[in-house]
Amino acid sequence: MAGQKIRIRLKSYDHEVIDQSAKKIVETVTNAGATVVGPVPLPTEKNVFCVIRSPHKYKDSREHFEMRTHKRLIDIVDPTPKAVDSLMHIDLPADVNIEIKL
């Protein structure tokens, strides 16, 4: 797979879980003999939701909730077949969204 690059993009609501997952991916790929660039932290996406506390009136009383999406980017330069195989068999937590592009 000479000249190729695999780009892995991780998303999660918990920054500790996404950092552990990125560390696990980097360790398995480097043990398989490929070179890794990253993990690169991407900007955190912050969604704020404004909700009226009362169901009927008192519009001035509101509550704000926020949801943060943490993102990391990992590039694997010149992946070996062993590295690709180890990537396919890695176990990661369910709350981490993974996008892999070749």
From Swiss-Prot:
One of its GO terms (molecular function) is structural constituent of ribosome. The keyword Ribonucleoprotein applies. The keyword Transmembrane does not apply. It holds the Pfam family Ribosomal_S10. It comes from the Bacteria. GO terms for biological process: translation. Keywords: Ribonucleoprotein, Ribosomal protein. GO terms for cellular component: ribonucleoprotein complex; ribosome. Involved in the binding of tRNA to the ribosomes. Belongs to the universal ribosomal protein uS10 family. NCBIfam families: PRK00596.1, rpsJ_bact. Part of the 30S ribosomal subunit. This is Small ribosomal subunit protein uS10. It comes from Bifidobacterium longum (strain NCC 2705).
